[in-house]
């Protein structure tokens, strides 16, 4: 609802998870219900950020629906897939309205009516057009999944040719935002990132590229600080281990004087007298 065109309507108590439903004519609720803290937290984490992006979803000028095509070529009617956006920012939404998981791809939109001089005609658009891609060698699409905050990368030419392949768990959804096309640099950074991720996502694109191209340096540091080197250093330092300091000499016992000798013997003399 938060990503569909038009005005989203929230019922009373929907965010809090209240079961009692009543209209504006009610002065007070009949039930004393407590808000569902987990449901409120999920709305704050998953729904409210999308409501702040309503400018991407409210209009219909760029709204397109897609058939979700399964690997066997059939259309999975349980999956809702659509794109929308503005001239400079695009969004793509997929939702699986079933318990069974869904695997498939989207490439071409469903036909929609367009007015022309002779009345109306049906047209379709492909996903590459919807995302503003200019397919070509060395061009890539970067886009972020809102719920997981992971970035994904795909070849623009592959998206135009085969579409976007998606896996959705039962009642799962994916909302892709911040989609933008980039051209690879002379060092092939984005090609290397695409090949390394293999379709998976990353939390930080720049850090992932850095990890790839500094992998040899990281390995050298890891080897330098590895157990073998530490063992050799310990062995080397052990050869020059300082000798323990000699124990301090105890002061020589003072020779007993005649008075001390008599005092020491006094208890024994007292016992003898008894």
Task: Report the location of each language-model feature.
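Carbohydrate-interacting/catalytic domains
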Residues: 2-5, 9-10, 14-274
């Amino acid at each position: 609802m938060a990503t569909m065109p038009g005005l989203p309507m929230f019922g009373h108590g929907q965010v809090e998870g209240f079961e009692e439903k009543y209209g504006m004519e009610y002065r007070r609720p009949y039930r004393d219900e407590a808000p569902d803290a987990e449901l409120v937290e999920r709305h704050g984490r998953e729904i409210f950020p999308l409501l702040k992006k309503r400018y991407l979803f409210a209009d219909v000028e760029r709204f397109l629906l897609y058939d979700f095509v399964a690997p066997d070529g059939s259309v999975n009617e349980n999956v809702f897939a659509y794109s929308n956006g503005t001239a400079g920012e695009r969004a793509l939404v997929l939702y699986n309205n079933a318990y069974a998981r869904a695997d498939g791809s989207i490439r071409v939109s469903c036909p929609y009516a367009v007015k022309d001089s002779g009345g109306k005609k049906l047209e379709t658009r492909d996903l590459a057009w919807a995302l503003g891609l200019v397919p070509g060698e060395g061009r890539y699409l970067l886009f972020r999944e809102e719920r997981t905050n992971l970035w994904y990368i795909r070849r623009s030419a592959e998206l135009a040719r085969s579409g976007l392949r998606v896996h959705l768990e039962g009642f799962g959804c994916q909302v892709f935002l911040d989609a933008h096309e980039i051209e690879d640099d002379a060092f092939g950074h984005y090609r290397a990132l695409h090949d390394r991720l293999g379709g998976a996502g990353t939390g930080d694109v720049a850090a992932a590229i850095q990890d790839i191209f500094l992998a040899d340096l990281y390995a050298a540091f890891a080897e330098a600080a590895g157990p073998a080197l530490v063992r050799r250093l310990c062995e080397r330092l052990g050869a020059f281990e300082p000798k323990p300091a000699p124990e301090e000499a105890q002061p020589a016992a003072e020779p007993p004087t005649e008075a001390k000798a008599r005092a020491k013997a006094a208890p024994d003399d007292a016992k003898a007298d008894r």
